[in-house]
């Protein structure tokens, strides 16, 4: 799931992804957060 959250580092995606899909598994891709629900 790509969410509308700008990022420079994967760690910046942890909280937004936790809020969005309840999972900390994420990656910063092309300046946007990508969340994985493991």
UniProtKB/Swiss-Prot annotation:
Keywords from the named record: Disulfide bond, Ion channel impairing toxin, Neurotoxin, Potassium channel impairing toxin, Secreted, Toxin, Voltage-gated potassium channel impairing toxin
Residue intervals passing through the bilayer: none
Major localisation: secreted
Known tissue expression: Expressed by the venom gland.
Site residues by UniProt (Aromatic residue of the functional dyad): 36
Disulfide feature: 7-28, 13-33, 17-35
Intracellular or extracellular location(s): Secreted
Site (Basic residue of the functional dyad): 27
Gene3D superfamilies: Knottin, scorpion toxin-like
Gene Ontology CC: one annotated term: extracellular region
An example Gene Ontology molecular-function term: ion channel inhibitor activity
Family label: Belongs to the short scorpion toxin superfamily. Potassium channel inhibitor family. Alpha-KTx 02 subfamily.
Domain comment in the entry: Has the structural arrangement of an alpha-helix connected to a beta-sheet by disulfide bonds (CSalpha/beta). The N-terminus is probably essential for channel affinity.
Additional notes on this entry: NTX2 has a thousandfold less affinity than NTX, for the potassium channels (Kv) of synaptosomes. In addition, it shows a lower potency (over two logarithm units) than noxiustoxin (AC P08815) in producing 50% blockade of the probability of opening small conductance calcium-activated potassium (KCa) (obtained from cultured bovine aortic endothelial cells).
Known role: Blocks voltage-gated non-inactivating potassium channels (Kv) and unblocks inactivating potassium channels blocked by alpha-dendrotoxin in synaptosomes. It is not toxic to mice and crustaceans, but has a paralysing effect on crickets.
Stated name of the protein: Potassium channel toxin alpha-KTx 2.4
Gene source species: Centruroides noxius
